[in-house]
Structure formats: structure tokens, C-alpha cells
Amino acid sequence: MFPTIRPRRLRQTDVLRRMVRENTLTVNDLIYPLFAVPGNAIAKEVVSMPGVYQLSVDKIVDEAKEVRDLGIPAIILFGIPEDKDTDATGAWHDCGIVQKATEAVKKAVPDLVVIVDTCLCEYTNHGHCGYLETGDLTGRVLNDPTLELLKKTAVSQANAGADVIAPSGMMDGFVQAIREALDDHDFQNIPILSYAAKYASAYYGPFRDAADSSPQFGDRRTYQMDPGNSREALKEVELDLLEGADMVMVKPALSYMDIIWRIKEMTNLPVAAYNVSGEYSMVKAAALNGWIDEQKVTLETLTSFKRAGADLILTYHAKDAARWLQD
């Protein structure tokens, strides 16, 4: 006890502090999200997400090269199609925007890992993540018919060269359905990163501007999780593990670090944390107003995800963080 035990002894110098640091953020932890749109030479900034852009495929390739040069190992692609319909055709069509972006990136930067978001909300004309009953205005997605769309989408993305399939729609049984579809088409070696614990969160607002994916009516609470629940997250993860998930994700991250920790304690699989758009935009807005030190707050936040148990971090801060970590 004091005065014999003095924890401050190990905090006296920067070198000592670094030697005993329990969790260290590295560029290898980072995954950078990108939004692909039709056209050429397009780089349209998302108003609610300073520094984030909707990009045409040629610009996506430029970004992918920069990401690679910064040492970031992976990107995750989201698509914004020109046309939307009830069948989410743009999600699974071989000439879909994400398929084109995937092919272009893998050709130009073959060593960069391309993760593809496997969801339907950006591609449906109602903004929900699957088929709806005729006349439904509440957002109650028909689960099992939607699985058929997700299977087609995953196979199409794999055909385009995706390295990792990341289903995010929170449909019951979606991991098993996608795993079986991939295996049936000789894609046994493509891993699945499941959005296993995805909450119905208010932090997604800016993303829906970026991805043009806001529901036209109702909400997503019948398929995304209640923010008040934690045991349910463990159940979702357990089911996804049984269905064949190779990695699992918690989304959002900042307000759900207890969930990251609990999931990390229950599984040996890699756990990803999605530092979502609202979390990003709050930091950006405060920094632009001079209220916080953007670099310090960002690196502290990302390190906290590591401390909570995240092995991978999807973040719009990835490029900035990579530069800061090099300094």
C-alpha cells in the first residue's frame, strides 16, 4: 500500500508510458469507408460529413491508391445507384455501381482488401433493407424473401472480386443464407464480416445523407436492435457464429463500447467496431469550431475502441489517423 506502491512511477516519462501501454492503435486496425456513384470525375462532398465524398469509380480508384499508400489495409464500399426499385436491382446486378467499383479497385490496387457492404437500403425505392408487404407503410421487411436478394447480391459482389462480404441488413438467418450461396458458387474462401449487433441508432443520420438511404416511411426498428438491449447482442452474435460468420461487427461504436467488450469476451473471432457517421461529424463540427483538438480527440476515441476489444475499426477518420500515426 501507499507509500510503498506508487502507480505514478510508471508514468514519469514518455518512454516508460509507451513501454507499459496496454493498447496501441496502429494503421493496420483501420478500414476506410467509400461511397461509389455513377459517372466520371465526380467528387461531391457530403455536407453533413466534412471531408467525406460521394465518388465516381475513377475517383474511387484514386482514393484506393491513396489509402494503400498510407498503409491502411482495407476499404469498405457502399453504392448509390442511379435508379432504385422494389427489387433492389442495383445491389445484385453484375453492372451495379459497387460491382464496377470493386472490379476497378482490385485491378488497380490488387493488394488492398475490398470489403463490400451487402445491404439493400441504398438500392430500394423505399429505403428499407428488403422486400415489404404490399401497402406496408411501417417498414416491416419480409425476412425470408429478402434473404434471396441478399444471396444474389453477395454472389454478384464476389464475382466482381470482393475480398470480404459484409451483410448489414440484420435479417434473421442472413449469414447462413449468404454462406451457403457463396459456397454453392465456389467462393468458399471469401469470409463474411457480419454486422451482428447493429442498433437502430440516431447516430446514422449523416450516413443516410452520404448513401441516400433514408427510409421513405416508417423506421428500421423492426430489424435493427433496440439501443437499450445488451443480452440481445450476445444472442445475435452467437447465432451468426453458428451460421458461419468469420468476423462480427458492432455498430455504432462510441455509445456501445460495453457491447464490444461483452462480445470480445464471448468469442475468439475478430471483432470490428464501426465508428459511424454521427460520431465522426460531431468531432468534425466541434473541431471546426475550435472547441476540441481534432487529432487528440480522434486518436483517443479510436484507441478507446481498441481498449474495449475491437480488432478492426471502420472509420471515416482513417486517412487522417494514418497520417497522424506516422508523425
UniProtKB/Swiss-Prot annotation:
Q: Kindly list the positions annotated as binding Zn(2+).
A: C119, C121, C129
**Cofactor(s) needed for function:** Zn(2+)
Q: Which residues form the active site?
A: K198, K251
Which top-rank group of organisms is this from?
Bacteria
Q: Name one Pfam family in it.
A: ALAD
Positions of disulphide bridges: none
GO terms (BP aspect) = heme biosynthetic process; protoporphyrinogen IX biosynthetic process
| EC top class named in words | lyase
Tell me the cofactor note: Binds 1 zinc ion per monomer.
Q: Which InterPro entries match?
A: ALAD, ALAD_AS, Aldolase_TIM
Residues reported in the UniProt entry to bind 5-aminolevulinate 2: S277, Y316
Listed A to Z, the keywords are: Heme biosynthesis, Lyase, Magnesium, Metal-binding, Porphyrin biosynthesis, Zinc
Gene Ontology CC annotations of this record: cytosol
Its Enzyme Commission number? 4.2.1.24
Primary role: Catalyzes an early step in the biosynthesis of tetrapyrroles. Binds two molecules of 5-aminolevulinate per subunit, each at a distinct site, and catalyzes their condensation to form porphobilinogen.
Q: How does it assemble?
A: Homooctamer.
What name goes with this protein?
Answer: Delta-aminolevulinic acid dehydratase
Give the species this sequence originates from.
Synechocystis sp. (strain ATCC 27184 / PCC 6803 / Kazusa)
The gene coding this protein:
hemB
